[in-house]
């Protein structure tokens, strides 16, 4: 007969295993319930519900609600008015001394805290513009993307769907925590608990209510930017999956025999329809995100320059201020990566699609040299080549990898200009001080 301790160990191990299985089944059941009970709501992919729940809580988007109540619409308008008010107020505070007077241009560039104030204002402006995009994101205009989703999601397993749901949940929570960290850092810097360089010197007219208002606006702005970047990444992923599926149809890995001309024409026709759906989905993404791509680069470039300038020009800087500047830089890098990499990948997948169109005739129809097939294939290849799948930023520049070189050169150029201005300013101040001492 085994000792009592062995019975106890067996009981505890069995109990732990049962609890783990119960929790895992409960989690799967909850995810399955969420994914299955919201089919009628107007969003592209059901796994995006965590992002849309975050937007619903922030009052930035109500696409997951079947009927928008008056209370939620009032809440959304209040959030938008708050973002507009705090953004204008923050820009008005740029270059303002604690006593309310304004700095001149030389004093502004010589003061790192004025630069950080400008960075705060740029973040709030980005959040305001992102919220405008999120208010209109959804409903019927996403229909081309939803059509592509139906084709790409039919081959996705339930396990892959749950995994993507958990990834989006993590991204939503991480975005909220990152935005909360920035808002809390800003508030504590204003009250002088931890940091000081993150905010401007406390203005005489600034109250606790104003600080809380700015902190909440900064939280909503940062969360809106992150959510919009995540949605852009997910929508671009729909296009990329559809492109890969079309390439596999055009150039299959295994083919026993060459099709007859009638079958070849039908296959080309089906591929043309699939490509047109992909192009329509790309047009929807460009309609929603073209201006977003433009101002994300227009905001992140000066933020990088100002933060580098602050780090180089600050005479004495403590570890907490270094951490705060690093947080700002990480935020800017994440935003740029989430907006840049998906667009680069779509451009490269589009180039592979052009190459596959040439291979389609030579490898798939190499035995039947039918003139009708050749003319139809030529038209299809011309269609792909003339309507390239490349996203643009308000038609000012196209999103490919060459833009990274322009980005780095712009950051370096503006940083060197600021640094040269700071060196000349310090030399002039030193000359004035020497002249005063000698006189």
UniProtKB/Swiss-Prot annotation:
<keyword id="KW-0297">G-protein coupled receptor</keyword>
<feature type="transmembrane region" description="Helical; Name=4">
    <location>
        <begin position="212"/>
        <end position="232"/>
    </location>
</feature>
<feature type="topological domain" description="Cytoplasmic">
    <location>
        <begin position="233"/>
        <end position="290"/>
    </location>
</feature>
<dbReference type="GO" id="GO:0043025">
    <property type="term" value="C:neuronal cell body"/>
</dbReference>
<feature type="transmembrane region" description="Helical; Name=5">
    <location>
        <begin position="291"/>
        <end position="311"/>
    </location>
</feature>
<feature type="topological domain" description="Extracellular">
    <location>
        <begin position="312"/>
        <end position="324"/>
    </location>
</feature>
<feature type="topological domain" description="Extracellular">
    <location>
        <begin position="89"/>
        <end position="114"/>
    </location>
</feature>
<comment type="similarity">
    <text>Belongs to the insect chemoreceptor superfamily. Gustatory receptor (GR) family.</text>
</comment>
<keyword id="KW-0600">Photoreceptor protein</keyword>
<keyword id="KW-0812">Transmembrane</keyword>
<keyword id="KW-0807">Transducer</keyword>
<dbReference type="InterPro" id="IPR013604">
    <property type="entry name" value="7TM_chemorcpt"/>
</dbReference>
<dbReference type="GO" id="GO:0050909">
    <property type="term" value="P:sensory perception of taste"/>
</dbReference>
<dbReference type="GO" id="GO:0030424">
    <property type="term" value="C:axon"/>
</dbReference>
<keyword id="KW-1133">Transmembrane helix</keyword>
<dbReference type="GO" id="GO:0070141">
    <property type="term" value="P:response to UV-A"/>
</dbReference>
<dbReference type="GO" id="GO:0007626">
    <property type="term" value="P:locomotory behavior"/>
</dbReference>
<dbReference type="Pfam" id="PF08395">
    <property type="entry name" value="7tm_7"/>
</dbReference>
<keyword id="KW-1003">Cell membrane</keyword>
<keyword id="KW-0675">Receptor</keyword>
<feature type="topological domain" description="Cytoplasmic">
    <location>
        <begin position="136"/>
        <end position="164"/>
    </location>
</feature>
<feature type="topological domain" description="Cytoplasmic">
    <location>
        <begin position="346"/>
        <end position="402"/>
    </location>
</feature>
<dbReference type="GO" id="GO:0009637">
    <property type="term" value="P:response to blue light"/>
</dbReference>
<dbReference type="GO" id="GO:0004888">
    <property type="term" value="F:transmembrane signaling receptor activity"/>
</dbReference>
<dbReference type="GO" id="GO:0046957">
    <property type="term" value="P:negative phototaxis"/>
</dbReference>
<comment type="function">
    <text>Photoreceptor for short wavelength (UV) light that mediates UV-light-induced avoidance behavior. Directly senses and absorbs both UV-A and UV-B light with very high efficiency. Absorption of UV-B but not UV-A light shows resistance to photobleaching. In contrast to other photoreceptors, does not use a prosthetic chromophore to capture photons and only depends on its protein conformation. Might have a role in response to white light exposure.</text>
</comment>
<dbReference type="GO" id="GO:0009411">
    <property type="term" value="P:response to UV"/>
</dbReference>
<dbReference type="GO" id="GO:0004930">
    <property type="term" value="F:G protein-coupled receptor activity"/>
</dbReference>
<dbReference type="GO" id="GO:0009882">
    <property type="term" value="F:blue light photoreceptor activity"/>
</dbReference>
<feature type="topological domain" description="Extracellular">
    <location>
        <begin position="186"/>
        <end position="211"/>
    </location>
</feature>
<protein>
    <recommendedName>
        <fullName>High-energy light unresponsive protein 1</fullName>
    </recommendedName>
</protein>
<feature type="transmembrane region" description="Helical; Name=7">
    <location>
        <begin position="403"/>
        <end position="423"/>
    </location>
</feature>
<keyword id="KW-0716">Sensory transduction</keyword>
<dbReference type="GO" id="GO:0007602">
    <property type="term" value="P:phototransduction"/>
</dbReference>
<feature type="topological domain" description="Extracellular">
    <location>
        <begin position="424"/>
        <end position="439"/>
    </location>
</feature>
<keyword id="KW-0157">Chromophore</keyword>
<feature type="topological domain" description="Cytoplasmic">
    <location>
        <begin position="1"/>
        <end position="67"/>
    </location>
</feature>
<dbReference type="GO" id="GO:0030425">
    <property type="term" value="C:dendrite"/>
</dbReference>
<dbReference type="GO" id="GO:0043005">
    <property type="term" value="C:neuron projection"/>
</dbReference>
<keyword id="KW-0472">Membrane</keyword>
<feature type="transmembrane region" description="Helical; Name=2">
    <location>
        <begin position="115"/>
        <end position="135"/>
    </location>
</feature>
<dbReference type="GO" id="GO:0005886">
    <property type="term" value="C:plasma membrane"/>
</dbReference>
